Amino acid sequence: MSIFEYNGSALVAMVGKNCFAIASDRRLGVQLQTIATDFQRIFKIHDKLYVGLSGLATDVQTLYQRFAFRHKLYQLREERNMRPETFASLVSALLYEKRFGPYFCQPVIAGLGEDDKPFICTMDSIGAKELAKDFVVAGTAAESLYGACESMYKPDMEPEELFETISQALLSSIDRDCLSGWGGHVYVVSPNQVIERTLKGRMD
């Protein structure tokens, strides 16, 4: 078993009309044994920028602390929030710095940039960026998430429709992956509000 699959995870981010959604499952396991059913994989960097971390749970928490620390330093120096593109470069550099003994995480970054234009990207464990204009996925449920998102996604969705689409894609995908599950966390972020919801899925 790959170390990336040790704790199990499912992460997806999707772009709508001047908004984005990011969702994850809630299971923390050790291989096939479930340890917790309310594990947080999506973290807020600031009001318009979120990062999701799939992979090894210990590295998820370590990396989030490092990202939060770097962003705080940036805020103190620049007196403004970081743009999503800048944050993606920061994450990429942090991961590449440790390329010979990498963090076992695949980040998904989603944010609203200038003129509230949505930005999403993912990268591998050594920081190679993959940009997208529709959706990005990561985690042990990535293959089924790709299929679900490709069949359900359509451009320029409003926040409520985007929530429905990403939720259905997530729930149908984690049903096909025994290492992720136990419902989901969904954040839908538009310029003037953040909707946070918890999904109840199959509890097995």
Swiss-Prot record:
Family matches, as InterPro entries: Ntn_hydrolases_N, Proteasome_beta_3, Proteasome_bsu_CS, Proteasome_sua/b, Proteasome_suB-type
Keyword Nucleus among record annotations: yes
Gene Ontology, cellular component aspect: cytoplasm; nucleus; proteasome core complex, beta-subunit complex
Biological process (GO), any one: proteasome-mediated ubiquitin-dependent protein catabolic process
Quaternary structure, from the entry: The 26S proteasome consists of a 20S proteasome core and two 19S regulatory subunits. The 20S proteasome core is composed of 28 subunits that are arranged in four stacked rings, resulting in a barrel-shaped structure. The two end rings are each formed by seven alpha subunits, and the two central rings are each formed by seven beta subunits. The catalytic chamber with the active sites is on the inside of the barrel.
Cross-referenced Pfam families: Proteasome
Function: Non-catalytic component of the proteasome, a multicatalytic proteinase complex which is characterized by its ability to cleave peptides with Arg, Phe, Tyr, Leu, and Glu adjacent to the leaving group at neutral or slightly basic pH. The proteasome has an ATP-dependent proteolytic activity.
Species the sequence originates in: Picea mariana (Black spruce)
Family membership: Belongs to the peptidase T1B family.
This protein's UniProt keywords: Cytoplasm, Nucleus, Proteasome
The protein, known as: Proteasome subunit beta type-3
Compartments it resides in: Cytoplasm; Nucleus
SUPFAM superfamilies reported in the protein's UniProt record: N-terminal nucleophile aminohydrolases (Ntn hydrolases)
